[in-house]
Amino acid sequence: MPTVEELYRNYGILADATEQVGQHKDAYQVILDGVKGGTKEKRLAAQFIPKFFKHFPELADSAINAQLDLCEDEDVSIRRQAIKELPQFATGENLPRVADILTQLLQTDDSAEFNLVNNALLSIFKMDAKGTLGGLFSQILQGEDIVRERAIKFLSTKLKTLPDEVLTKEVEELILTESKKVLEDVTGEEFVLFMKILSGLKSLQTVSGRQQLVELVAEQADLEQAFSPSDPDCVDRLLQCTRQAVPLFSKNVHSTRFVTYFCEQVLPNLSTLTTPVEGLDIQLEVLKLLAEMSSFCGDMEKLETNLRKLFDKLLEYMPLPPEEAENGENAGNEEPKLQFSYVECLLYSFHQLGRKLPDFLTAKLNAEKLKDFKIRLQYFARGLQVYIRQLRLALQGKTGEALKTEENKIKVVALKITNNINVLIKDLFHIPPSYKSTVTLSWKPVQKVEIGQKRTSEDTSSGSPPKKSPGGPKRDARQIYNPPSGKYSSNLSNFNYERSLQGK
């Protein structure tokens, strides 16, 4: 093992040789042997090996292996020095190997070391993006779980910081190709991260790019397979995939496949859905997603059939008035309760799809069914008016801090929901029914997004196909209030949210 003095002497030989460095192979071998010495010798070797690496291609493997030994040394200061110098080995055919090594080193728990690895990866990314991606994806596909996890997070956080001259169209195509391989077997959280990566690529910001992403999500959602409402993994996967798809839809990128699947497979099984997460109102969550997608549904093959399924489901939540005895009192039937949150979603979805078949209520339903529907609408509208007046009275004169209390936040949301339902019911009362009114769903930002405008992909905390529990989609901070799913009914029960309307 060489001493410190021998290392300096051989360094001097190489430094003084200028253009004839490659003739002093023995001197470079002495420096390589420095990795077997003590702490001081290793520190010097960590600096000297990369400095002359390019002059000895025949010793490339030995040099990289020597530096890798230092990257795994017990002494953290030696590891840091060795990692810092790794980009100097990233030349030609060695670069993918260096990228592979650096990706493996992401598993370190030392924060300073972790930052060095990140910086080194970014450094070689700028030298050769394709080669670096080769190393990263190699570990994502075949590496240890911790390495895979951190490599994916590296891509999801660092790609967006790279300039356009690094992320060329060819590089983005490689990212898409490799990502598709990974997406064949991913956890929920990984799926969400990859959607974040892909939706951020410049080449996928176009209409055709967004369409590619929607098809990718549809494949993950397994829309060709029958829906299994009792399987929490199946429910979870559909929820998370749909959450990822919703921000991609626009007037040019249609939600038709998803809306069709929801109408045909999910709505008929709504009451038997197994919730994948405790405390989640799974039925309301599904109806919210359907409502958001319905605005961007294109031409549907079985429109009348699916509209009828949606209509039938709406009827379940729009009760008939209770029968009255001769004296005008309740005849003993239980007073119906109005589930406003559900009705907002279903009525909005029906209103959106109904535009595509405007004579559905007048020509496709028989007179008796239409009369029944009008009675239900009228009863619901009567209850709405009572409740809207109560809410407005309760919120009258309240501003600033007063509106920030939990109770008042809930009332504000309830007012948005009931106002939306009121507008939609008025449309359907027209003769013939009208589908012209526009409302903003109660949980969405008040500020409208132009139909053709690009929307930013929503991020989620974790998600599924099919192994992870879902985290709800991140909502826009501009909205007034958005309580967790199911909170409307439970918390507003104290404020007669699901109102009994007998005698009103």
From Swiss-Prot:
Region feature (ARM-like and Heat-like helical repeats): 1-360
Subcellular location: Nucleus; Cytoplasm
Sequence positions bearing Phosphothreonine: T399
N6-acetyllysine PTM sites in chain numbering: K251
A Pfam family annotated for this UniProt entry: API5
Record-level Gene Ontology MF annotations: fibroblast growth factor binding
Renumbered residue ranges of the record's region Leucine-zipper: 370-391
Keywords of this entry: Acetylation, Apoptosis, Cytoplasm, Nucleus, Phosphoprotein, Repeat
Regulation: induction: Down-regulated in vascular smooth muscle cells (vSMCs) treated with benzo[a]pyrene (BaP).
Any one of the GO CC terms: spliceosomal complex
Phosphoserine: modified positions: S462, S464, S469
Sequence segments annotated as region (Disordered): 452-504
Record's keyword annotation contains Transmembrane helix: no
Record PTM text: Acetylation at Lys-251 impairs antiapoptotic function.
Annotated GO biological process: fibroblast apoptotic process; negative regulation of fibroblast apoptotic process
Gene3D superfamilies: Leucine-rich Repeat Variant
PANTHER family: APOPTOSIS INHIBITOR 5 (PTHR12758:SF19), APOPTOSIS INHIBITOR 5-RELATED (PTHR12758)
Role: Antiapoptotic factor that may have a role in protein assembly. Negatively regulates ACIN1. By binding to ACIN1, it suppresses ACIN1 cleavage from CASP3 and ACIN1-mediated DNA fragmentation. Also known to efficiently suppress E2F1-induced apoptosis.
Family membership: Belongs to the API5 family.
Protein name per its UniProtKB record: Apoptosis inhibitor 5
Native source species: Mus musculus
